[in-house]
């Protein structure tokens, strides 16, 4: 049977990947998946995660 609860799987995508124009780096998009509790966190998640394409920590925002 499926789990019941308020936890939902969300995808986080880097916000700086599209705006960066560094020619030495590839134009890949960094994405992470995580879970959040919809009851406690109603707004969109925004976390600092490592982006391997830019080789540094960047802000990742929740996408639909």
Swiss-Prot record:
Pfam families the UniProt entry points to: Ribosomal_L33 (PF00471)
One GO term describing the cellular component: cytoplasm
One annotated GO biological process: translation
UniProt keyword terms in alphabetical order: Ribonucleoprotein, Ribosomal protein
Record-level Gene Ontology MF annotations: structural constituent of ribosome
Gene3D superfamilies: Ribosomal protein L33 (2.20.28.120)
Domain of life: Bacteria
Region named Disordered: 16-42
Record field: compositional bias (Basic and acidic residues): 16-25, 33-42
InterPro entries assigned to the protein according to its UniProt record, in alphabetical order: Ribosomal_bL33, Ribosomal_bL33_sf, Ribosomal_zn-bd
Similarity comment: Belongs to the bacterial ribosomal protein bL33 family.
PANTHER family, alphabetized: 50S RIBOSOMAL PROTEIN L33, CHLOROPLASTIC, LARGE RIBOSOMAL SUBUNIT PROTEIN BL33C
NCBIfam families: PRK00504.1, PRK00595.1, rpmG_bact
Protein name, entry field: Large ribosomal subunit protein bL33
Primary gene name: rpmG
